[in-house]
């Protein structure tokens, strides 16, 4: 990351500054603790940038810890993708990767300690009964008939759970707190449940697995985390976080702080809904460029710097809000406008023949790779008497606001000649198949000698040298700003979220590599697709347009 990415300030950093100034802490130690049961999305990027960014700015440490307490939903595939995403965003964890499963022996010992203190019991209510006994926000819960078992009985039953003596769902370990608490999370929460499933790290060693709320706080303490940062939905869970640490023998007691999660327009962040999009094949996978996943954004052409900048701009607060998609798009547009080399590609091609150009000949035209950065150099682009232009760049008749090619009028070809449209050929349906023009041979990259003004400029690709390319025009996945609020979020999928075109690109695009963007002049920002592109088939994804067409449509 560059020094230009200035250090932000927010309420969490103010707390850290106070903790360091008062001597409460002498160093800063954070962590990013994803569950490996799916791919990370842009919301996780906010947490990654916060936790790793704080550690970086305060010369502290940030752990990457996988909260792997549910073997049924987790997979090593997700572990690998999360590691890749964190590193791609420009961060690296302190020391080795941690797993909550590293602490299973200690977690079990702490559970036994709670039983010995009379603060945990084995419950044999069914999961449905536990929900029923828990009560509601307006009605207190009621005690389980198994709540007052003796310490000895609970120890024996917990050991029976550990050794596979109960079937799944037939017993669990619960904290003994207060079934009348105004906070439902404190109404004897489950600490351990039974799952006969092979774990990707521990194999079949365990058939009981700790719950998140029991695991999370102890893992933080064991790792010496100073500031445990969570999103706002875990605010009530802080009471349980503190209760567990207050009631076990552990020397460190981290403090949890909550910040607002990232909500983004025109997409969904729910793992369940994202999974439904994938499994029902509404998208091509977790890395589909329309998905809000980090892997999807990367494949679409977003840069790590643009995502970090986005997370910096939206800031860290305690108030939930929804961020406009235009804010994210603005970050990548600014990044690529500054850094992407230019190239020419025609997305909706129509043939244009220059009738007075020397037949069968061609020449090289010099073009800058970036109009404002001479240090990025230039390239030689072939020009000939037959070229492709975009169909939208020609009209037989047009008003004065139309600054492109019109029958009988002139336009400049980018970095080449001034041409004049003379006639067209059409097919049986009346569609234009060829535009015939003449050119002014004395206007190569300069104005006409007689002083006439030619205002319009269009891009082109020499037909004899053109590379056939597939162009995937990606757009917002949903047609409404808040698809999650729809009765059926699948019903508001944008039918135009992917339009595939067959076009032509200039020869320099043969050297394109996945992850490196171009500005296709006058069209937008594009990158080579990492899945479908091959040496024989160039496939480009539209990352973002040159301007926000959604804002214009909403005016």
UniProtKB/Swiss-Prot annotation:
Keywords: Aminoacyl-tRNA synthetase, ATP-binding, Cytoplasm, Ligase, Nucleotide-binding, Protein biosynthesis. Its main location: cytoplasm. It catalyses: tRNA(Gln) + L-glutamine + ATP = L-glutaminyl-tRNA(Gln) + AMP + diphosphate. It is found in: Cytoplasm. GO terms for biological process: glutaminyl-tRNA aminoacylation; glutamyl-tRNA aminoacylation. The keyword rRNA processing does not apply. Residues 317-324 are annotated as: Interaction with tRNA. Gene3D superfamilies: Glutamyl-trna Synthetase, Domain 2 (1.10.1160.10), Glutamyl-tRNA Synthetase, Domain 3 (3.90.800.10), HUPs (3.40.50.620), Ribosomal Protein L25, Chain P (2.40.240.10). InterPro entries: aa-tRNA-synth_I_CS, Gln-tRNA-synth, Gln/Glu-tRNA_Ligase, Gln_tRNA_ligase_bac, Glu/Gln-tRNA-synth, Glu/Gln-tRNA-synth_Ib_cat-dom, Glu/Gln-tRNA-synth_Ib_codon-bd, Glu_tRNA_lig_a-bdl. ATP binds at residues 35-37, 41-47, 231, 261-262, 269-271. Pfam families: tRNA-synt_1c (PF00749), tRNA-synt_1c_C (PF03950), tRNA-synt_1c_C2 (PF20974). GO terms for cellular component: cytosol. Its EC number is 6.1.1.18. Monomer. Belongs to the class-I aminoacyl-tRNA synthetase family. This is Glutamine--tRNA ligase. The lineage of its organism: Bacteria, Pseudomonadati, Pseudomonadota, Gammaproteobacteria, Enterobacterales. The gene is glnS.
């Amino acid at each position: 990351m560059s020094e230009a990415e200035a250090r932000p300030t927010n309420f969490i950093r103010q707390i850290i500054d106070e903790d360091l100034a008062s001597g409460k802490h002498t160093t800063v130690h954070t962590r990013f603790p994803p569950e490996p049961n799916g791919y990370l999305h842009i919301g996780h990027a906010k947490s990654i940038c916060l936790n790793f960014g704080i550690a970086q700015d305060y010369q502290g440490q940030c752990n990457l810890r996988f909260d792997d307490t549910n073997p049924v939903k987790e997979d090593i595939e997700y572990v690998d993708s999360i590691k890749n995403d964190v590193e791609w965003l420009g961060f690296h964890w302190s020391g080795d990767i941690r797993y909550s499963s590293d602490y299973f022996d200690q977690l079990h010992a702490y559970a036994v300690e709670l039983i010995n203190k009379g603060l945990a019991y084995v419950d044999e209510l069914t999961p449905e009964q536990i929900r029923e006994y828990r009560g509601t926000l307006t009605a207190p819960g009621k005690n389980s008939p198994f709540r007052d078992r003796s310490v000895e009985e609970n120890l024996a039953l917990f050991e029976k759970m550990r050794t596979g003596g109960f079937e799944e769902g037939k017993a669990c370990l619960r904290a003994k707190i207060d079934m009348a608490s105004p906070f439902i999370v404190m109404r004897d929460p489950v600490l351990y449940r039974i799952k006969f499933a092979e774990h990707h790290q521990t194999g079949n060693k365990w058939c009981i697995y700790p719950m998140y709320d029991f695991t999370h706080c102890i893992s933080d303490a064991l790792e010496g985390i100073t500031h445990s940062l969570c999103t706002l939905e875990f605010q009530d869970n802080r009471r349980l976080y503190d209760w567990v640490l207050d009631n076990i023998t552990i020397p460190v007691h981290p403090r949890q702080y909550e910040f607002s999660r990232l909500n983004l327009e025109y997409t969904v962040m729910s793992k369940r809904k994202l999974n439904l999009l994938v499994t029902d094949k509404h998208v091509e996978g977790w890395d589909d460029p329309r998905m809000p996943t980090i892997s999807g954004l990367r494949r679409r052409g977003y840069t790590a710097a643009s995502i970090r900048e986005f997370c910096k701009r939206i800031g860290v607060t305690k108030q939930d809000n929804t961020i406009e998609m235009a804010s994210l798009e603005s970050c990548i547009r600014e990044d690529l406008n500054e850094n992407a080399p230019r190239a020419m590609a025609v997305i909706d091609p129509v043939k244009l023949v220059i009738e007075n150009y020397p037949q069968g000949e061609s020449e090289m035209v010099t073009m800058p790779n970036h109009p404002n950065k001479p240090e990025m150099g230039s390239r030689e682009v072939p020009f000939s008497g037959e070229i492709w232009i975009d169909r939208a760049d020609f009209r037989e008749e047009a008003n004065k606001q139309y600054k492109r090619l019109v029958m009988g009028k002139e336009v400049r070809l980018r970095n080449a000649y001034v041409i004049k449209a003379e006639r067209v050929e059409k097919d049986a349906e009346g569609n234009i198949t060829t535009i015939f023009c003449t050119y002014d041979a004395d206007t190569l990259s300069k104005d006409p000698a007689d002083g006439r003004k030619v205002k319009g400029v269009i891009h082109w690709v020499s037909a004899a040298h053109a590379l056939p390319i597939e162009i995937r025009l990606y757009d917002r996945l949903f047609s409404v700003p808040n698809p999650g609020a729809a009765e059926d979020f699948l019903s508001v999928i944008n039918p135009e979220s992917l339009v595939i075109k067959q076009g032509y690109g200039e020869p320099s695009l043969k050297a394109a590599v996945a992850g490196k963007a171009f500005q296709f002049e006058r069209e937008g920002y594009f990158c080579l697709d990492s899945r479908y592109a091959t040496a024989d088939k160039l496939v480009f994804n539209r990352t973002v347009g040159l301007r926000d067409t959604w804002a214009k449509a909403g005016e």
